[in-house]
Amino acid sequence: MSLDISQFPVLAQANTPNELRQLPQALLPQVADELREFLLKSVGISSGHFASGLGTVELTVALHYVYNTPFDRLIWDVGHQAYPHKILTGRRDKMHTIRQKDGLHPFPWREESEYDTFSVGHSGTSISAALAMAIAAEKEQAGRKVVAVIGDGAMTGGMVFEAMNHAGDLHNDMLVVLNDNEMSISENVGALNNHLAQLMSGRFYTTLREGGKKVLKGMPVIKEMAKRTEEHLKGMVVPGTLFEELGFNYIGPIDGHDVDALVETMRNMRNLKGPQVLHIMTKKGRGYEPAEKDPIGWHAVPKFDPSLFKKPTTKPGLPTFSQVFGKWLCDIAEQDEKVLAITPAMREGSGMVEFSQRFPKQYFDAAIAEQHAVTLSAGFACEGFKPVVAIYSTFLQRAYDQLIHDVALQKLPVLFAIDRGGIVGADGPTHQGAFDLSFMRCIPNMVIMAPSDENECRQMLYTGYCYDAGPSAVRYPRGCATGATQVEAMTALPIGKGVIKRVGKRIAILNFGTLLASALTAAESLDATVVDMRFVKPLDVDLVKEMAQTHEVLVTVEENAIMGGAGAGVLEQLQKLRMPKAVLQIGLPDEFIKHGSPEEVTHDLQLDAEGILAQINAYLAQ
């Protein structure tokens, strides 16, 4: 259900940036207030990312007011903070559908709107893309401006500094807005720095600055003295040395919730030459007290009533696989102080909060730097420690070279706890864990495990901890576990051995992972054998051979891309054994999986019990 726009009289006049730019600047504070209220109520209806968007309302209004979007390019990093952008760019009436099946995409998405100039979802990509667009703009000579908006969290990623180093060297015209919400806005930032930013971005100062550079060009000693004097003046209130050293002109920090100051500063900066950084200070969750006090807890929210000032209470249910991992990690750390846990800024999502509090000296948050996190773990393994890398499937993609070159090649005993394997649902194609089995299976020295339930997950984690001949991975899905009883005692599983769960006739279903329950349900109608394969690599070749010899048809089931996945491994072994056999591979198709609830996506892909049965019957009928 969409909101009644008549409750937002000024925002109603700004359904697009063109309409926004027709309004007098004096109305912009009211636009921002109504936009924040609209966002608050809209996310309450739809669920979704919340605190980040509340913090970028004034910034979004100012950007679309000053810049001629979509002609001017605006790139959002990650995109959690882009809900206000969607509201102001013609998608206001569809905001209640965001992250839902057939609804608005959770992140800026090129296919959705001309205002979304670059599709995003992973961190640290905006400046690289913006630099390319700035280079293209210079070649076109059409007067196009380019702006990248990036948060302070994303600034921890190495790709960001690679891009800034390149941009500073090329010196193309572009603006990087650094949205810094790590600290509250002090009076100093809100007043003095707003004035200083407008002064330093103004025409008189920049003309003087550029003219001085030309005059002093042939006098390097004097030029260096002048540069140091300027840095001393700015350094009294401005922490911009790093950006200046990278070749950027730095302005700020300024109050990111003062829309008039943002507009005036951006107007001044719009025509500056070379790469620019505008540093703004914002508050995550701005305007909604619970989110201001707990921005992490309110980062993403279910449907809720904003008037209650709390998230809806949920009945205690099954633990999530992330919680199963977190408990195992604490249990094993109690036994072994050499266990070290590493995560790339995913403490909460990976279930590591308790561990980080109880074992702070054994916990390492590498920030949004997946490559560094994996090689850090390799170094720990070299020194005899037991590193455990907790990482989402989609983010492990970013450290693929490190996984191969720094871990597997050296046969280092690093345990990868891979969360969000398979369908994640509402976050869509940028976050589905569709490829990990495929891209890990081809790496020598890897052991890859796919648990069917929480108890098997716990035992597999212990198996990986005990395995010292090389790296191992335990891959589990997002969401609640299956309800299986967890055995507290930990036992290492025999490497590369599966378990027969049901004995049937004619058809054998070889299951990899948590679709086992659905496979068993489908098997009842087919009187099929069901095998919990457990290990994707090394594959239980003896069991595959036995199933091929005693059944007419083999069916592989996995929540991973069919291409190169676990089922492909079964086919490779049958080929190697010279055993021609009818094999149906069930898994994720050769496409990027769209957003929707996990249940909806699973049903649409025919990966629930009903769908598995239908796929097998259709195959048998051919």
Swiss-Prot record:
Cofactor note: Binds 1 Mg(2+) ion per subunit.
Catalysed transformations (reactions): D-glyceraldehyde 3-phosphate + pyruvate + H(+) = 1-deoxy-D-xylulose 5-phosphate + CO2
Record-level GO cellular component terms: cytosol
GO molecular function: 1-deoxy-D-xylulose-5-phosphate synthase activity; magnesium ion binding; thiamine pyrophosphate binding
Binding positions (thiamine diphosphate): 80, 121-123, 153-154, 181, 288, 370
Function field: Catalyzes the acyloin condensation reaction between C atoms 2 and 3 of pyruvate and glyceraldehyde 3-phosphate to yield 1-deoxy-D-xylulose-5-phosphate (DXP).
UniProt-listed GO biological process terms: 1-deoxy-D-xylulose 5-phosphate biosynthetic process; isopentenyl diphosphate biosynthetic process, methylerythritol 4-phosphate pathway; terpenoid biosynthetic process; thiamine biosynthetic process
Record keywords: Isoprene biosynthesis, Magnesium, Metal-binding, Thiamine biosynthesis, Thiamine pyrophosphate, Transferase
InterPro entries reported for this sequence: Dxylulose-5-P_synthase, THDP-binding, Transketo_C/PFOR_II, Transketolase-like_Pyr-bd, Transketolase_BS, Transketolase_C, Transketolase_CS
Native source species: Shewanella baltica (strain OS155 / ATCC BAA-1091)
HAMAP family, per database record: DXP_synth
EC number: 2.2.1.7
Binding-site residues, Mg(2+): 152, 181
Quaternary structure note: Homodimer.
Family: Belongs to the transketolase family. DXPS subfamily.
Pathway(s) the chain acts in: Metabolic intermediate biosynthesis; 1-deoxy-D-xylulose 5-phosphate biosynthesis; 1-deoxy-D-xylulose 5-phosphate from D-glyceraldehyde 3-phosphate and pyruvate: step 1/1
NCBIfam families per UniProt: dxs, PRK05444.2-2
Protein name: 1-deoxy-D-xylulose-5-phosphate synthase
